[in-house]
Amino acid sequence: MTLTNRPKKLGGRVTTSRTARKASWYPNNLQLISDKALENANDLLTYLKWNEEHGITLFRVGSELFPWHDHYKLHDLPDYDTISEKLFECGEYAREHGHRLTTHPGPFHVLGSPRDEVVEKSLIGLERHSEMFDLMGYTPSFENKINIHVAGAYGDREATARRWIKNWHRLSESCKSRLVLENDDKASMYSVRHLYELIHKYIDNPITFDYRHHTFCTGDLSEQEAFFMARETWDMHGVTQCTHYSESRRQEKKLLIEKMFDHHNISLDTIHEWPTFEKEYKNFCKIKEQAHADYVLNTPNTYGVDSLDVVVEAKAKELAILPILEKQKELLIL
């Protein structure tokens, strides 16, 4: 049994991202949100214990552990004390067992936005994520990173970077001590080089290197060059570098489509005779190049580096991680 497919009779799917429709609670039913947050905190401990049993020591906490967190103060939640105690228990367990916890707030946290209202909500949201780690008992550090993107260049990378830095200075010291930036997956946005030259040089923040994103936005660097440029930004703080690895959902589905065509002797000229397969093919054609695959078949090139944390971004979550761990065991046996 895994956590993603846990049967309902055993409690159902484990997640740290339960939420609710805004209309179902706002503004007079904060208890509903409090209930969701407590369930999320309880499941975080379930995740950590399962990870320990399976040799997984890196975990990304759901960014909606406190649903709609920019609409209230955490201490206003009816179950705040109980939630705080549970989160501290989670942090204590993670520290005792050598687990690293991180989080990745959603794409609406945009410090470089030209719109004041977007920036204000972003500042609140980032502070809530930092407060979550505070409740877990963590000293502010890039070890428990809050990972975001610049999330838009607005036609002028340099001006947007300056706005981003200006608003970064408005964050609390604890939040700034956790906030890291990740390279983008669009050529018009921010590569590792752009992040390094336009932002890191001014505030010394670490850069999370995303292998797949680099293929879309290289900044005229090879993968190896970008990897080590990002690594330098972690080394200067004495914190283990964290990277992201994923594979192409489009390529994953392409292999399945090709097998389907071969097995049934289908071509694009005859696919209309197979309505079910035609629907599958049309869905395949809609998949964006940047989309993450459900699983990963390979592991990233770490260029001889031993001290490195790799977050595997795959839709199947721990179901995608287990086969990788099995492969590693086989290699150790060999």
Give the label of every model feature segment:
Residues 105, 147-152, 181-185, 209-211, ...:
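Short, structured patches in soluble enzyme cores that scaffold and shape functional sites
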Residues 126, 132-133, 143-154, 210:
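Contiguous N-terminal and early-domain "leader" segments and peripheral loops that mark the onset or edge
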Residues 1-100, 107-138, 142, 170, ...:
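Alpha/beta catalytic barrel-like cores
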Residues 150-152, 157-167, 179-183:
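Multi-pass alpha-helical transmembrane bundles in non-GPCR membrane proteins
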Residues 215-219:
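Short active-site loop/helix that positions an aromatic residue
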